[in-house]
C-alpha cells in the first residue's frame, strides 16, 4: 500500500466538488455493498418505534433539510440552494435536478427552519428531518 496518510485523504476529499463527492460516495457504496443513508434512517426510525417506552429520550439536536422537489419555479429554487450551500451554479442545479436531495445536513434547528423557509418561499417542496 502506498504511503498515503489519513490527512492526505481528508485533504483530497475536502477539495472535491459536491458532485464529485456524491459520485465518490456512490462508488464506495457499490464497492463495499453498503449504503451511507441506511444508518441515518434506521436511527431516525428507532425513537418512533420505541413509542412511550423511553421517557427520558434525547431531543434531536441536529437536523437535515431535504429538497423533495423544485416545484414550479426551478430557477428560484436553484438560487435558494446556492445561497444556502455556497455551491456554484452547476452544482446547485445538479442538486435540484436530483431531488430528493439533502441541502443542509447536521445543522441546528434554527438554521434548518430558516433553510426550510427559504426553500419553500422559492417554491420548493422541502422537509426537515
From Swiss-Prot:
Pfam family, one: Ribosomal_L12
Keywords tagged on the record: Ribonucleoprotein, Ribosomal protein
One GO CC term, this protein: cytosolic large ribosomal subunit
InterPro entries documented for this protein: Ribosomal_bL12, Ribosomal_bL12_C, Ribosomal_bL12_C/ClpS-like, Ribosomal_bL12_oligo, Ribosomal_bL12_oligo_N_sf
Origin superkingdom: Bacteria
GO BP field: translation
MF annotations from Gene Ontology: mRNA binding; structural constituent of ribosome
Record Gene3D superfamilies: 3.30.1390.10, Single helix bin
Record text on subunit structure and interactions: Homodimer. Part of the ribosomal stalk of the 50S ribosomal subunit. Forms a multimeric L10(L12)X complex, where L10 forms an elongated spine to which 2 to 4 L12 dimers bind in a sequential fashion. Binds GTP-bound translation factors.
Function text: Forms part of the ribosomal stalk which helps the ribosome interact with GTP-bound translation factors. Is thus essential for accurate translation.
Similarity-based family: Belongs to the bacterial ribosomal protein bL12 family.
Name listed for the protein in its UniProt record: Large ribosomal subunit protein bL12
Source organism (scientific name): Maridesulfovibrio salexigens (strain ATCC 14822 / DSM 2638 / NCIMB 8403 / VKM B-1763) (Desulfovibrio salexigens)
Amino acid at each position: 500500500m502506498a504511503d498515503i496518510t489519513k490527512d492526505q485523504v481528508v485533504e483530497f476529499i475536502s477539495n472535491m466538488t459536491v458532485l464529485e463527492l456524491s459520485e465518490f460516495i456512490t462508488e464506495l457504496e457499490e464497492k463495499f455493498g453498503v449504503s451511507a443513508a441506511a444508518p441515518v434512517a434506521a436511527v431516525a426510525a428507532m425513537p418512533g418505534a420505541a413509542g412511550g417506552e423511553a421517557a427520558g429520550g434525547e431531543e434531536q439536536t441536529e437536523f437535515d433539510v431535504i429538497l423533495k422537489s423544485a416545484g414550479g419555479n426551478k430557477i428560484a429554487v436553484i438560487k435558494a440552494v446556492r445561497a444556502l450551500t455556497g455551491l456554484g451554479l452547476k452544482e446547485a442545479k445538479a442538486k435540484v435536478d436530483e431531488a430528493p436531495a439533502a441541502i443542509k445536513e447536521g445543522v441546528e434547528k434554527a438554521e434548518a427552519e430558516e433553510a426550510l423557509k427559504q426553500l419553500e418561499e422559492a417554491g420548493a417542496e422541502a422537509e426537515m428531518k
